[in-house]
Amino acid sequence: MDRKDVSITSFDGLRLHGRYYEYKKGAPTEILFHGYRGNAERDLCGGVHRCFEIGHNALIVDQRGAGASEGHVITFGAKESRDCLAWVDFVIKNIAKDARIILTGISMGAATVMMAASCPLPENVIGVLADCGYTSTKAIIKKVIRDMKLPAGPIYPLVRLGALLFGRFDPDKESPLTSMKKCTLPVIFFHGDTDDFVPCYMSEENYAACAAEKKRLVIIRGAGHGLCFPVDPDTYFEELRRFFP
């Protein structure tokens, strides 16, 4: 499987790295975004094979602060969503000006593409695939704090202060759920019903909030966090083929 290493410069001057895999010219192109502290090579190679199986080109990207990309601060989709817009522009300018683009993300990557979906986007973007995304940065941070058996009440404000000072973003204001209320692009949501990291109800709430006329929520039985496709690839393929014919 041939790959081409590519890069862009973010709005704040970071060099961001990606790998492009072409299935065939004229096929839809998925831009795939990994989750928190992940990287493209480790977390998205299975996504490339899934793209080829369904007949899509694949651009897998290292999010800021991950893999071969520059940056030291992860912003849970706040700045990553702006990076997503830059990757869309890259595909149109460097791969095909008439490219049909699907924004795909897992976990924090799903938050990234959901937040990007409420921004002005070119008509090339035909839809969004959000796999096990959370409702808001604040909600998932508080959930993780509680999972650590710590009190979220006094600790979260300190986390927020750190984000404001060092990351220049406000976790209270970053919300995929709010973005979904403004999204008119087709969105397909996947979530595993045994996900104990990002609870399944978060995708249910994102789905309910989504303003798009075309939307679908697929719950994969027995799938943990980020494991919908490995647990039930047949259903995953069937749902994607039906949603993006």
Task: Name each model feature, range by range.
Residues 182-184, 189-191, 195:
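Short beta-strand/loop motif that positions the catalytic acidic residue
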Residues 223-233, 237:
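Catalytic histidine-centered segment of alpha/beta-hydrolase-like enzymes
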Residues 36-50, 63:
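The serine-hydrolase catalytic nucleophile loop
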Residues 196-202:
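Conserved alpha/beta-hydrolase "acid-adjacent" motif
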Residues 1-25:
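N-terminal cap/lid segment of alpha/beta-hydrolase-fold proteins
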Residues 115-170, 178-179:
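Hydrolase active-site cap/lid region
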Residues 51-70:
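Conserved alpha/beta-hydrolase
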Residues 74-95:
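Alpha/beta-hydrolase active-site loop
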